[in-house]
Amino acid sequence: MATTIDARALAAPLVEALLSTAAEQIRAAAPRIAGLPASDAAAVLPADLLPQVRNFLLTMVKEGLSGELNAVAEALQTYLETGRRVIDASVTSAIELSSEQQERITSELRRRYGDVHVTYHVDPTLIGGLIIRVGDQVLDNSLRARLSAVQRALQAS
């Protein structure tokens, strides 16, 4: 079976770490800058803040929204805990599927499962058909699996 790298899965720990760090930094900075004018807020922020967090905090102060920082940190934490609930799906076929076939499969998976991230793989040993993995469910409709089932049935009789 051909191996492919799912870049999205590889990036997930980095995304989680960045969001977690941002939430922690926002939560820690909120009491320091509460009620300060924008001109004074930059001076009380720690030097080791992520640049994006620093810019975000200063923008929130400038817009008069520093009172919402704890809610923002909480929202980031909730996002981390629940995620976007995107389900990963993998479709393996014996031959390369056309764009139209991939679109039909993706559309059907989204209809059944909601927000789905689908990766496509080719494995010529399947002979024909598809293997579809969605979360922990596997639908093996490959010719190889059907032939194996026939072989087992013949051996059992």
Curated annotation (Swiss-Prot):
Keywords: ATP synthesis, Cell membrane, CF(1), Hydrogen ion transport, Ion transport, Membrane, Transport. One of its GO terms (cellular component) is plasma membrane. It comes from the Bacteria. It is a peripheral membrane protein. It holds the Pfam family OSCP. Signal peptide: none annotated. One of its GO terms (molecular function) is proton-transporting ATP synthase activity, rotational mechanism. It is found in: Cell membrane. InterPro entries: ATPase_OSCP/d_CS, ATPase_OSCP/dsu. The keyword Cell membrane applies. Belongs to the ATPase delta chain family. F-type ATPases have 2 components, F(1) - the catalytic core - and F(0) - the membrane proton channel. F(1) has five subunits: alpha(3), beta(3), gamma(1), delta(1), epsilon(1). F(0) has three main subunits: a(1), b(2) and c(10-14). The alpha and beta chains form an alternating ring which encloses part of the gamma chain. F(1) is attached to F(0) by a central stalk formed by the gamma and epsilon chains, while a peripheral stalk is formed by the delta and b chains. F(1)F(0) ATP synthase produces ATP from ADP in the presence of a proton or sodium gradient. F-type ATPases consist of two structural domains, F(1) containing the extramembraneous catalytic core and F(0) containing the membrane proton channel, linked together by a central stalk and a peripheral stalk. During catalysis, ATP synthesis in the catalytic domain of F(1) is coupled via a rotary mechanism of the central stalk subunits to proton translocation. This protein is part of the stalk that links CF(0) to CF(1). It either transmits conformational changes from CF(0) to CF(1) or is implicated in proton conduction. This is ATP synthase subunit delta. It comes from Chloroflexus aggregans (strain MD-66 / DSM 9485).
